[in-house]
Design a protein with these regions (language model features):
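N-terminal secretory/targeting leader peptides
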Residues: 22-29, 58-157, 167, 177-368
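N-terminal glycine-rich phosphate/adenylate-binding segment common to multiple enzyme folds
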Residues: 160
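Short, low-complexity disordered leader/linker segments with a strong preference
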Residues: 1-67
Length: 368
């Protein structure tokens, strides 16, 4: 009898234990870790704890939560990656978990052009992306092309005078108004862009006859040609190997992106010409936008404002921090004392690309 009673008690305990395990599992969301820690990203320890979304602050996803997939070509420890994380954090907190941002970084969803093609093709596989402002030029964002003109911004303050203006809002909405299927949420910047090479350089004359990587962008093509070099289109994801094998001799990127993508390993020379301030914007497809309620749309807009301000607060400090790390690691950094020859070399590019947009160009120039 005692043995039978003991057997019953043990069976009951086992059943209760299995039941307890069954109800506890769903409390841990499965999607969040994959979205926040792409396989190719840099170790989480590289991003200061105060600058990354804290896990304990994340909103618990609602049962009927809308998940928006967000693409980022760079790692999360870059200026743009950190800005993306801030946007994700703000959206999820402000929506109480009714909107989840599935952030996929380090180019796992493709290059900027790949991502844009996917977004414009519909289907909802990618809903949001952080892109270079000029990337929309071929997709109904002609005004945004002005933001990548060489030396249009004389300082960061000049850029932010534009980015916080009514004119910026007009630029953000242009693609949607032209029927391209995407709209801008907010602007930011990733620092001034500089050329870097696999060979030793001294000044502007060091580029003559060299192959310099460009994206499929007419302004960058013109800029490189103005330096006497040969523009060579290479996908961003293939740039490291292209530099390593000599397919190209150099390229250009903001300082933080140059380091995070390990380009110093194959191109350890950088000249600080600052030809363009890397204006960025975060865009969303009209398809994704239209499935949100007006309240949820407002949440994205307000979260974008916070992320934009955050971007402004970290950009210069992060850039200087990385620049010092590059110098300490042995990268050859060449200062440019006189920018005049560079400005003269790119005048034809500016004159050609402001045709029909002269008034907008002048408005931006006057904001400095």
């Amino acid at each position: 009898m005692k043995k039978r009673l003991l057997s019953v008690i043990l069976t009951a305990v086992t059943v209760l234990s299995m039941t307890a395990c069954g109800v506890s599992a769903p409390e841990v969301p499965e999607a969040a870790p994959a979205a926040e820690t792409p396989a190719a990203q840099a170790p989480a320890t590289e991003t200061p704890a105060t600058e990354a979304p804290a896990a304990e602050e994340a909103a618990t996803p609602a049962a009927d939560a809308i998940t928006l997939v967000m693409a980022e070509v760079n790692p999360l420890d870059t200026i743009v990656g950190m800005t993306d994380q801030k946007f994700k954090e703000e959206v999820e907190a402000r929506s109480g978990g009714s909107i989840i941002i599935d952030l996929q970084a380090s180019g796992v969803l493709g290059s900027e052009n790949d991502v844009l093609d996917t977004m414009l093709g519909g289907g909802g596989t990618i809903d949001i992306s952080r892109i270079s402002a000029f990337a929309l030029t071929s997709y109904g964002g002609q005004k945004s092309m002005l933001l990548s003109l060489p030396y249009i911004f004389t300082s960061r303050e000049h850029f932010w005078n534009f980015a916080t203006s009514d004119l910026a809002q007009e630029f953000l909405q242009e693609p949607s108004e032209n029927g391209s299927g995407v709209r801008g949420l907010f602007y930011g910047e990733e620092g001034f862009r500089h050329f870097f090479t696999s060979y030793e350089i001294e000044d502007i004359n060091s580029f003559k006859g060299k192959k310099i990587r460009v994206s499929n962008d007419p302004i960058m093509n013109g800029l490189v040609e103005g330096l006497g070099a040969s523009p060579t289109v290479v996908a961003f994801g293939e740039l490291y190997s292209a530099l390593q094998t000599g397919v190209v001799d150099g390229a250009e990127q903001p300082i933080a992106n140059y380091k995070s993508n390990a380009f110093p390993e194959v191109a350890p020379y950088m000249i600080l010409d600052g030809h363009t301030l890397g204006a960025i914007q975060v865009i969303i497809t009209d398809e994704a936008w239209n499935k949100l309620s007006p309240e949820q749309q407002d949440i994205l807009v307000e979260a974008g404002k916070v992320a934009s301000e955050y971007n402004r607060s970290i950009s210069e400090e992060k850039e200087q921090e990385v620049l010092q790390e590059l110098k300490d690691s042995g990268v050859t950094i060449i200062e440019v004392d006189d920018i005049t020859p560079w400005q003269e070399a790119v005048k034809p590019v500016i004159e050609e690309n402001i045709k029909g947009l002269e008034d907008y160009y002048q408005k931006i120039v006057d904001m400095k």
